Amino acid sequence: YQYSEELAAKTKAKPELVFHGAFEKMAKIKKGRHSVDGNKDFYGGFDQMPEIVPGVKGNSFQFSQDYDHLNITDKIIPSLEWTDPFSLSIWMSTDKRKKGQSQTLIANTGEKNSLWRGWEYYLDDQNRVNLRLINVAPSNLIHVRSVDSLKLNIWHHLTLTVDGSGKTEGVKLYRNGKEIQTEGVIDNLYKTIKPTRPDIEKGFVERKRDIIIGRSYSGFLGDYGLFIGKLDELKFFNGVLTPFEVQSIHSENSEEKEKIKWPVIQKHLVEKDSKILELKKQLKENREEYLKTYAPITEIMVMREMDKARPTYLYNRGNYSEPLYTVEAKVPETLPAMDKDLPKNRLGLSQWLFDPKNPLTARVAVNRYWQMIFGKGLVATPDDFGVQGQLPSHPELLDWLAISFSENWDVKAL
């Protein structure tokens, strides 16, 4: 739109506020369960509960124990799909920063036997803000991370928006009303992120799983991603907040009343235009259809190359604590060299194995078939064609069989 101000009369309200956790009070419902803010679907599931302390607005909850985390049932926030646009904001302050230990803010990811499927919003061991939408870790997911770390022992207003594209570029992270610089760690999501459980007959089936606050379901994190600090004013929206809305929500509980600039308002008006909203609705339907197309496709576990090969070493007598020098991906020098055009990976190795200039593959293969049929190979040491192995009993026959076999690798003809 050339003149965004023309949209002022057409603009719609902010996305639907699905849930507001004020972190004001707790009440015991029964043994081992407490409701939060009078909502039985927002609860603590153990006798340990967070401490109520002053917050940015009224009270906040101080998390400091192993089992003082909170849960939100799917009656409030249903299981999300990566095609679902959503936003959330929360005030937080932490005094924890420990190498190798993350801190879960809010998540519903499972553990290893559930493929870690779900979504998680957390701080890593450098207190960088992270979001992951996961089908199966570590391959089918997106992972976005802030570049800078959060300072300890001060309040931060964190906001997250996800546009439903399933791409890292569709994730925005904000701190105190302003977008922060991020980096895409992994960008490869194309299947569902709804929680799952193993099933003997069906493999994996969809299941309901509460959203968890202040702790992870995943034991592989070592400390279960325990959050140590204070949380306040959690808001969850069904849709994408614009930068204008993010700043507005931040100013509600902030002493900093910064004037919102006109370009931010213009962008907001464009995003809320009825035509734009209708196009986004159609786009969401197309993405859902795309997801349905991929859903029935069965995938199997195979090896894949690393993006960047890690160093490989020759070790002193095989002792992993005593590397002598690095080695490269090559073939034995006593055999024909690998073509320079071949990649130095498993594909290149397979092409080299069946290269007509390589005499070893066909000779070893026909010798093993001879051994399977007659009980003893033409070479009596089938595992050793080197200098310590035995010579072939009928070398000309072995040569003829190997040459004939390598012409088309036809086992039946052999």
What annotation goes with each model-predicted range?
Residues 38, 258-413:
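Primarily short, surface-exposed interaction patches in extracytoplasmic proteins
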Residues 1-298, 307:
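Extracellular glycan-associated modules
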